[in-house]
C-alpha cells in the first residue's frame, strides 16, 4: 500500500472516491505498463513513483473540471498507454469509455489491461481519429472527449470536436504554457463548433509538476467537411 496515501490525497483533492479496490487496479496497471514497455514503446516514464505521479495523478486531476463527473460517455483520442482513459475507468466504472489509438500494438496492450482489471463498458479502437469521426455511430455521440496527446490545440480540436454532441465538452490536457497556443487555435475552435470556456491549472502532489486543462464546450455542430483527410490535419492546421 506504498502509494495509497498519495493517490487517495489526489482523489480527495478533486472530490472523487478512492478505495482499496481502485488502488489495487492502479498498481496492477502500473506493473502491466512496466512489463509491456519492455516489448513495445508505451512510455519513457518507467519508475514506480514517476508512473504514479506523472501519469496516474496527472490523469486524476482531470476531475478538477467539476462537470466531468456528469459526462457519462467518454472518448480518449490518442490514448497511447491508456492515459487518461484507463484511470478514468478505474475511478468511475459506470462511465462508458472508448479509447482510440493509431498503433495496434498499444490497442492489444489496452485489451489485456481491460481484461486483467475486469473493466466493463470499455472499447479499445485501432485507427485514426479523422476516420472514425466521419462514422455515424461515433460522430457527435459523446458527452466528453479527452486527450493527452502531443499536438497543438488547433490540431487536437479538429481531431476531437467532431465526436462531441452539442452541449458536451472537449478536455485537452496540456503543459504549463498554453496561452500562445490557445491564441493561435481560437479560430479553429470556433470553426469546429467549439467555445473556449476556461483553463484550469493543475498541480501534482509532492512534485513541482504544473499542467493545464483546456476546457472547450461544443456549442454547435461541426461542419461535415471536418476533420479533413489523413495527414491534412497535422500538415496544415486550421488557423
From Swiss-Prot:
HAMAP family named among the record's database cross-references: 16SrRNA_methyltr_G
InterPro entries reported in the protein's UniProt record: rRNA_ssu_MeTfrase_G (IPR003682), SAM-dependent_MTases_sf (IPR029063)
Organism, as annotated: Clostridium tetani (strain Massachusetts / E88)
GO cellular component entries: cytosol
Cellular compartment(s): Cytoplasm
Function text: Specifically methylates the N7 position of a guanine in 16S rRNA.
Family recorded in the similarity comment: Belongs to the methyltransferase superfamily. RNA methyltransferase RsmG family.
An example Gene Ontology molecular-function term: rRNA (guanine-N7-)-methyltransferase activity
One Pfam family matching this protein: GidB
Gene3D superfamilies: Vaccinia Virus protein VP39 (3.40.50.150)
PANTHER family named among the record's database cross-references: S-ADENOSYL-L-METHIONINE-DEPENDENT METHYLTRANSFERASES SUPERFAMILY PROTEIN
EC identifiers of the protein: 2.1.1.-
Class of this enzyme: transferase
Entry keywords, A to Z: Cytoplasm, Methyltransferase, rRNA processing, S-adenosyl-L-methionine, Transferase
NCBIfam families, A to Z: rsmG_gidB
Keyword Cell cycle: no
Residues engaged in binding S-adenosyl-L-methionine: 78, 83, 129-130, 148
Protein name per its UniProtKB record: Ribosomal RNA small subunit methyltransferase G
